[in-house]
């Protein structure tokens, strides 16, 4: 029986090191484990999707909303071997096998990353298609060998289409700066609001008017344009999104010391958090809270007017020491000398607690959704045929998140990041209750 997937992770992984230096094997396993931990904040299930482009780890929540994908290049591993199809021993059926794992099964294996970093010398991952198992072997010091067998189900991975490069606003920030900006928020914070103008960026607590006595602190953090590696604002806007997935992406970004790119447009449109490194690429698509239709239409009108006034972005060269001239628009900037962040944190007085729910938000019109065809495949539905609303479960306040189903799942191997994304996502469940959720099915 030929293994469907065979991986070795050892010392060949080079990450921001001189050519004569390599990262220790434990650090490679730590990066792999951090990716799994980040995806665990999205869903209770994990897909292993091998291809000639590398190994993709995918995750999507039970509502087919929040989506995450981390693609490891083949050179990330010491040895990478995969097959597009597998022939079972007892039958002549050839299957295009992709592994869907329960997060409850695989997450404990990579939970204690500090111990793995110190003790693991080599990690080997391969599949036993005849027994529907993924075998994870750790070769540790002093000849200790740990073997984990995780059962999987054959399932086609989900493909998401979203054209993030067409977003009006793009921010690129170092994880150190972003971690300092969100340190004021408590672990119970469910959503945060990102407000941007050409002069500053504000990250603040969402739903100030709906807070009760148990959550009566309203926090704001202002970040200047000079703190960003890249700063482009095409429209002044405010978006509210789930805080849980953001923390997972930030933790993963800190592990590989790579900046985070944020792409977004109007409220109700999806936002993308992406990490592009030498040997891996990560993309997370999150929902934003949909505004009232009247406000959304006014924002679109404002965007068109601002687009006419603002010229194409001209990048400043901070390395050459060139100053920004009057020809450079104020809404785009490259990183210069870092400045201190300044915060504004004030307690909020609550006069009444009768109506603590946030205003009713209507779902934006969906672009595509998935419906089963007679042959079991998935097809696209036009935008005009979808116009319902959906409540966010587990929240005491009435909120409506703009949501639509992702593109049809396909067994064809496609590059997950060469295609544009066009999906919206809803907030996932609480991270503290991660192990209580049931596995979703597609």
UniProtKB/Swiss-Prot annotation:
InterPro entries in the cross-refs: DNA_clamp_sf, Rad9, Rad9/Ddc1
Keyword Phosphoprotein: yes
GO annotation, biological process: cellular response to ionizing radiation; DNA repair; DNA replication checkpoint signaling; mitotic intra-S DNA damage checkpoint signaling
Keyword Signal in record: no
GO cellular component annotations of the record: checkpoint clamp complex
Keywords: Phosphoprotein
Listed Gene3D superfamilies: 3.70.10.10
UniProt-listed CDD domains: PCNA
Modified residues (Phosphoserine): 387
Subunit structure: Interacts with HUS1, HUS1B, RAD1, RAD9A and RAD17.
Protein name: Cell cycle checkpoint control protein RAD9B
């Amino acid at each position: 029986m030929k293994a469907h997937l065979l991986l070795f992770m050892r010392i060949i992984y080079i990450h921001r090191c001189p050519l004569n230096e390599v990262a220790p094997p434990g650090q490679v396993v730590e990066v792999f484990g951090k990716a799994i931990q980040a995806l665990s904040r999205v869903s209770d299930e994990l897909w292993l999707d091998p291809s000639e482009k590398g190994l993709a780890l995918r995750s999507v929540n039970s509502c087919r909303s929040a989506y995450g994908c981390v693609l490891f290049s083949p050179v990330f591993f010491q040895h990478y071997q995969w097959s597009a199809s597998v022939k079972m021993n007892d039958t002549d059926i050839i299957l295009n096998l992709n592994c869907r794992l329960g997060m409850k099964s695989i997450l404990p294996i990579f939970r204690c990353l500090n111990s793995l970093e110190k003790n693991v010398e080599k990690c080997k991952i391969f599949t036993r298609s005849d027994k529907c198992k993924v075998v994870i072997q750790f070769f540790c010091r002093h000849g200790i060998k740990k073997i984990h067998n995780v059962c999987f189900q054959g399932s086609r991975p989900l493909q998401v289409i979203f054209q993030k490069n067409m977003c009006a606003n793009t921010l690129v920030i170092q994880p150190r700066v972003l971690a300092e900006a969100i340190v004021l928020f408590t672990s119970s914070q469910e959503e945060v609001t990102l407000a941007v103008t050409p002069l500053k960026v504000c990250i603040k607590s969402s739903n100030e008017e709906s807070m009760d006595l148990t959550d009566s602190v309203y926090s704001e953090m202002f970040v200047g344009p000079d703190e960003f590696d890249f700063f482009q604002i095409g429209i002044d806007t405010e978006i509210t999104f789930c805080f849980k997935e953001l923390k997972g992406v930030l933790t993963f970004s800190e592990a590989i010391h790579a900046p985070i790119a944020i792409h977004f447009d109007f409220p109700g449109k999806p936002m993308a958090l992406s990490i592009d490194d030498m040997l891996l690429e990560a993309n997370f698509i999150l929902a934003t809270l949909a505004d009232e239709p009247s406000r959304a239409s006014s924002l679109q009108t404002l965007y068109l007017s601002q687009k006419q006034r603002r010229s194409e972005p001209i990048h400043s060269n901070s390395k050459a020491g060139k100053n920004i001239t009057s020809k450079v628009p104020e809404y785009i900037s490259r990183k210069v000398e870092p400045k201190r962040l300044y915060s504004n944190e004030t307690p909020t007085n609550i006069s009444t607690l009768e109506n603590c729910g946030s205003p009713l938000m209507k779902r934006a019109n969906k672009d595509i959704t998935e419906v089963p065809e007679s042959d079991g495949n998935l097809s696209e539905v036009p935008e005009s045929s979808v116009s319902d609303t959906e409540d966010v479960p587990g929240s005491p306040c009435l909120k409506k998140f703009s949501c639509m189903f992702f593109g049809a799942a396909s067994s064809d191997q496609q590059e997950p990041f060469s295609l544009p994304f066009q999906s919206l996502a809803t907030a996932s469940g609480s991270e503290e209750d991660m192990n209580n959720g049931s596995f979703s099915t597609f």
